[in-house]
Amino acid sequence: MSTKEKLISHVSKEEAVGSRNKVTVVGVGMVGMASAISILLKDLCDELALVDVMEDKLKGEVMDLQHGSLFLKTHKIVGDKDYSVTANSRVVVVTAGARQQEGESRLNLVQRNVNIFKFIIPNIVKYSPNCILMVVSNPVDILTYVAWKLSGFPRHRVIGSGTNLDSARFRHIMGEKLHLHPSSCHGWIVGEHGDSSVPVWSGVNVAGVSLQTLNPKMGAEGDSENWKAVHKMVVDGAYEVIKLKGYTSWAIGMSVADLVESIVKNLHKVHPVSTLVKGMHGVKDEVFLSVPCVLGNSGLTDVIHMTLKADEEKQLVKSAETLWGVQKELTL
């Protein structure tokens, strides 16, 4: 008899039950691993699969996470370059792609990443035809459109991480300015994730008190408190972090886990995520931009109708036109 047989007496045959909450992260770079650890520490899945083309890095990351199994409640952590390892995932998070270089705009990255997606997306669909696809790779709005087109999935099952992080940065800086916790500072950044994002100043509030009623010039020129700088800090934030440490990882990883949580726990929380906005706010083209959306079990269930001022809507339409200008040149 083996040590195991001497130690344990078998009572019943374990029935093979598939994972109920399997999450896959594609890409084990800085963002992928920050997303993975954030998902694990929030106990959001019973199985985590990692995929990447760089086999040694992948193997090392999987082993490193497995060595911490004692401290986690996720009993299965797997990884392979073969997409069969991702089979039957509930949520697939795509972080893979060429990394944004210092000073490079997110839009510059496009065609490089489209070519990578042509390999990734069909493989995800093959093994998890019912999954919810979450795109994080930049430029996220265009790549969410690309993933939607390549997957053939209905629009509610393809979500971009969008301005969920931009809005978090906004609320953090607002909190610093007011000496309040970010969760008590309400403000939404919509539109493109990145340089032409739109801060909805009309909706900024604390405890239901609209800050624009207290300071009518908030967000505009001639505001003595220069709140406009808060949005500039949001836009420059990522570039600043990249300049200092070479990449961004922790905040986007936490943002991804926040979105995954709303889906797997069916929370019906509202998040600013990238979705198909054609027909909304004067947008005429087939583009993905961030607007407040309800996330639950089946993905994106509803869109909240924001009351935007004319100039905010104009900025949104301008963003859409910029994105469409790039999209129509892409070879899919």
Swiss-Prot record:
One of its GO terms (biological process) is lactate metabolic process. GO terms for molecular function: L-lactate dehydrogenase activity. Its EC number is 1.1.1.27. NAD(+) binds at residues 29-57, 99, 138. Pathway: Fermentation; pyruvate fermentation to lactate; (S)-lactate from pyruvate: step 1/1. Keywords: Cytoplasm, NAD, Oxidoreductase. The active site is at residue 193. It comes from the Eukaryota. One of its GO terms (cellular component) is cytoplasm. Gene3D superfamilies: Lactate dehydrogenase/glycoside hydrolase, family 4, C-terminal, NAD(P)-binding Rossmann-like Domain. It is found in: Cytoplasm. It catalyses: (S)-lactate + NAD(+) = pyruvate + NADH + H(+). CDD domains: LDH_1. Substrate binds at residues 106, 138, 169, 248. Belongs to the LDH/MDH superfamily. LDH family. Homotetramer. Interconverts simultaneously and stereospecifically pyruvate and lactate with concomitant interconversion of NADH and NAD(+). NCBIfam families: L-LDH-NAD. This is L-lactate dehydrogenase A chain. It comes from Rhinogobiops nicholsii. The gene is ldha.
